[in-house]
From Swiss-Prot:
Coiled coil: none annotated. It comes from the Eukaryota. Belongs to the plant rapid alkalinization factor (RALF) family. This is Rapid alkalinization factor.
Amino acid sequence: MGVPSGLILCVLIGAFFISMAAAGDSGAYDWVMPARSGGGCKGSIGECIAEEEEFELDSESNRRILATKKYISYGALQKNSVPCSRRGASYYNCKPGAQANPYSRGCSAITRCRS
């Protein structure tokens, strides 16, 4: 009388999981179930990247990457320049006494303003 194939399969799977449990955190079976770090980095990209990796790109590469975005102005891409050196002033309106955020949407149904 032969041994059922289902029983052999169950024994093999059980032996596999027992060997994984015995390996513990040695990393021998990371290809099956990769270990995950519980915390991870929850800060900004600059805080999560190691300091030596953060500044690997030269300034020309950084300017080219920033130039592909539509919301970066040509003035912001100038080398060694500060957009507005006045403390607390908006980058868009650097005049003394100017509003920091002068943008205002008009009254429409989506803004739910009352007239």
